[in-house]
Amino acid sequence: MLKRLLRLPVRSYHSSSSEHVKSPNLGPLNYGKDSPQYAVLSHAIKVSVPVVGFNERALVHSLNQLNYPSTMLSIIGASNSPSLFHSSPAVMELIKFHLVDKRLRLVEDLDQESQEKPSLEDLLLKRLEMNVPVAQHLSQLLSHLAIPGPFTVETALPELHRLSDDLIYYSSEKDHPDFAWYSKRIGLSCAYVSSELFMAQDSSANYKETFEFAKDKLERTMQLGEYYNNTEEWAWYTLLNTINLAKSQMARG
């Protein structure tokens, strides 16, 4: 696990403009928008996942709708190692695609040269709004992200960091290259994850309570400096979910 952490590509200690230059590629995905993988995964996220969730059925449904053979599943999941707890490498790729695609779409229409930037709250709420079509399946998504292993270390956590980094960089939030740079991003990451957890259980109309929760969580995190409490909260969330998932898997035999 430590070796994997050391091999991970990391962003510099503080943001530089070169890290946020928009490009046609979809890194860290290893395929482009003109590829069969992108066609299937994009269709699955838009059409199949809102109905059946983040699972292989969603992929099979999209393969059938697009007239691709079922053997495409192995191609879609080729970049992911098999996992004991994850359902399949293809589903892991579906989750990765969801995380990366939504992060890129969040800022694709923003003008980097504009002097007027959206607030951090606006961008956070916009990202949560992107979850509305799949909100009823967020518990399933989050359970995958909480599983310890290569996928969590190499995909889920780096994507969460990239999201928090982009939220701050593209917003009007003031940023400084000091110790608070890192703690601010951890706090924002935890505020976002907490909001997703809330949304997964929210039954209010149009997820109104989720957005109110997110506003309050963000304000307490960014204005009152709940960085360290949030870090502890994230650690406990991951640990407890891991234990509960392991117990569930053992009970099933």
Which sequence ranges carry the predicted segments?
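N-terminal mitochondrial targeting presequence
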Residues: 1-30, 253
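C-terminal peripheral helix-coil segments that are non-catalytic and often amphipathic
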Residues: 4, 204-253
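Amphipathic alpha-helical segments used for helix-helix packing
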Residues: 131-151, 158
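Hydrophobic alpha-helical segments that form the core
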Residues: 181-200, 214-220
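Amphipathic alpha-helical packing segments from all-alpha helical-bundle domains
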Residues: 151-172, 185-189
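Short, amphipathic alpha-helix enriched in basic
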Residues: 27-71, 78-88, 92
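Hydrophobic alpha-helical connector segments
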Residues: 108-137
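Short, basic, alpha-helical segments at the C-terminal edge of helix-turn-helix-like DNA-binding modules
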Residues: 88-104
